A protein has these predicted regions:
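Short beta-strand scaffold segments in enzyme catalytic cores
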Residues: 86-88, 100-103, 139, 237-239, ...
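Short, glycine-anchored, charge-dense loop/turn motifs used at functional sites
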Residues: 6, 103-111, 239-247
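Active-site-proximal beta-strand elements of phosphoester/diester hydrolases
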Residues: 3-13, 20, 100, 113, ...
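CN hydrolase (nitrilase-like) catalytic-core segments centered on the catalytic cysteine
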Residues: 62-85, 153-256
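Residue-level detector of high-confidence beta-strand sites
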Residues: 100, 113-115, 249-251, 259
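Cys-nucleophile CN-hydrolase/nitrilase-fold catalytic domain and related Cys-dependent amidase chemistry
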Residues: 17, 29-106, 110-113, 179-210
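A short, polar/charged loop-to-alpha-helix boundary motif
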Residues: 116-130, 254-271
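Cysteine/selenocysteine-centered motifs that mediate thiol-based redox chemistry or coordinate metal-sulfur cofactors
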Residues: 138-168, 177, 267-294
Length: 294
C-alpha cells in the first residue's frame, strides 16, 4: 500500500480578499495538523468568482507568478511540510492573463504550474474576457507525493485532457473548480447538472485507472450586473478511486475541511484488470484532432 492523505478545503468566499486568504491559511494549517500530505484548494480561491461580469477593473485582481500570493502559499507549504495545489489569476504581461494552478513543494518552492486550457464563455462564466488560453500544455507536475495531473474546472468536461495527463504518467487527476447553479434553475435541473459534473470526472477515473480529486467552492455569489440571479456554487467536492468509486463527497451547501486517504498502488492493480491503455487503437485516432468530422 502507498497511502496518501489528501486534504481539501471547500469554502465560501466573500468580497474581502484578505479575509478569504486568512481563512485559507487557517484551513491549510488545520489540514496539515491533521496529517494531510497534499492539500488542494478551489479555483480562484482568493476572491469572489469575478467572471460573472465583464469588468476591466477586475484585471486589478491579477498578479505575477512569482508574486505576493506565491510568497504566501510557498511559505505556508514550507511551514506545514505539505504539497499545496493553488489556483491564481496570473498577470503574465500587460493585457495578458491566465487562470493558473500553481503547485508548491514541501520546501516552499514552486514545483510547477498549469495554465487552464479550456476557457468557457457563457452567461455568468465570461472567462474568455479575462483569461488567455493556456500554452503550457497538459503536463503532469512531479512532486514528493507523486506526479500530479493538475487541470482546472472547465477542463474537467474533456476526456482528452485527462487522457493526455494519464499518458504522461500522472498518478492523480486534480481539478480546482468553481461551478454552480444559475439560481433560477429548477431543483431537477440543479440535480442533473451536479450529477453530470460528478459523473464525468468519475468516468475519467475509470477510463484512465486513476484517482480523481475535485475541489469546488460553495455558497451564493450575486451577479454584480444583476442580469442573472447569481450563482449558487454547489460544493460537492469529492475524491474518487481508479474504478470511479466515491471515497468521499462533500455537502452542497456548507464549508468543509476534508481529509481522504487513498492508496496510489490501487491504480496498478486496476490497470491490470482493465488494461485500457494497452488496448487503445492509436493507429485509428488521427481524426480526433478535427473540430468535427463531416
Amino acid at each position: 500500500m502507498r497511502e496518501l492523505k489528501i486534504g481539501m478545503l471547500q469554502l465560501h468566499n466573500t468580497a474581502d480578499i484578505q479575509k478569504n486568504i486568512e481563512n485559507l491559511i487557517e484551513g491549510i494549517k488545520d489540514l496539515a495538523n491533521r496529517g494531510a500530505e497534499l492539500v488542494v484548494l478551489q479555483e480562484l480561491h482568493n476572491s469572489l468568482y469575478f467572471c460573472q461580469v465583464e469588468d476591466v477593473d477586475n484585471f486589478n485582481l491579477a498578479e505575477p507568478i512569482p508574486g505576493p500570493s506565491t510568497e504566501i502559499y510557498g511559505a505556508l507549504a514550507k511551514e506545514c511540510g505539505i504539497v499545496l495545489v493553488t489556483s491564481l489569476f496570473e498577470k503574465r504581461a500587460a493585457g495578458l492573463y491566465h487562470n493558473t494552478a500553481v503547485v508548491f513543494e514541501k520546501d516552499g518552492t514552486i514545483a510547477g504550474k498549469y495554465r487552464k486550457m479550456h476557457i468557457p464563455d457563457d452567461p455568468a462564466y465570461y472567462e474568455k474576457f479575462y483569461f488567455t488560453l493556456g500554452d503550457i500544455g497538459f503536463k503532469p507536475i512531479d512532486t514528493s507525493v507523486g506526479r500530479l495531473g493538475v487541470l482546472v474546472c472547465w477542463d474537467q468536461w474533456y476526456p482528452e485532457a485527462a487522457r493526455l495527463m494519464a499518458l504522461q504518467g500522472a498518478e492523480i487527476l486534480i481539478y480546482p473548480t468553481a461551478i454552480g447553479y444559475e439560481s433560477s434553475d429548477s431543483e431537477e435541473e440543479q440535480q442533473r447538472q451536479r450529477e453530470a459534473w460528478t459523473t464525468v470526472m468519475r468516468g475519467h477515473a475509470v477510463a484512465n485507472g486513476l484517482p480523481v480529486v475535485a475541489v469546488n467552492r460553495v455558497g451564493y455569489e450575486p451577479d454584480p450586473s444583476q442580469q442573472t440571479n447569481g450563482i449558487q456554487f454547489w460544493g460537492s467536492s469529492f475524491v474518487a478511486g481508479p474504478q470511479g468509486e466515491l471515497h468521499y463527497r462533500a455537502c452542497t451547501d456548507d464549508e468543509e475541511s476534508i481529509i481522504v486517504n487513498i492508496d496510489l498502488e490501487r491504480s496498478e492493480n486496476v490497470r491490470r484488470w482493465w488494461p485500457f491503455l494497452r488496448d487503445r487503437r492509436i493507429d485509428s485516432y488521427g481524426e480526433i484532432t478535427k473540430r468535427f468530422i463531416d
